[in-house]
Amino acid sequence: MVKNSVISVISQEEKKGSVEFQVFNFTNKIRRLTSHLELHKKDYLSQRGLKKILGKRQRLLAYLAKKNRVRYKELINRLDIRETKTR
């Protein structure tokens, strides 16, 4: 499973406060909530939580893209997420 290999790599390389680790945790939460919401479509509290986590992850990714573009590209490729839209 891809998730387990990413966990071992990130947890060994990074500290828990790093941007990469935080984005990784948010991505796991997003995937869990998405699968939960597929079963429970009217769980509006979980929908709100998902939107909040998506916003936090988006802000962290924008920060990382601004500070270090190479680390940003590696992270989005490793986590298999789309690149954020730039204005």
Curated annotation (Swiss-Prot):
GO terms for cellular component: chloroplast; ribonucleoprotein complex; ribosome. Belongs to the universal ribosomal protein uS15 family. GO terms for biological process: translation. One of its GO terms (molecular function) is structural constituent of ribosome. InterPro entries: Ribosomal_uS15, Ribosomal_uS15_bac-type, uS15_NS1_RNA-bd_sf. It is found in: Plastid, Chloroplast. PANTHER family: RIBOSOMAL PROTEIN S15, BACTERIAL AND ORGANELLAR, SMALL RIBOSOMAL SUBUNIT PROTEIN US15M. This is Small ribosomal subunit protein uS15c. Its main location: plastid. Part of the 30S ribosomal subunit. It comes from Solanum lycopersicum (Tomato). Keywords: Chloroplast, Plastid, Ribonucleoprotein, Ribosomal protein. The gene is rps15.
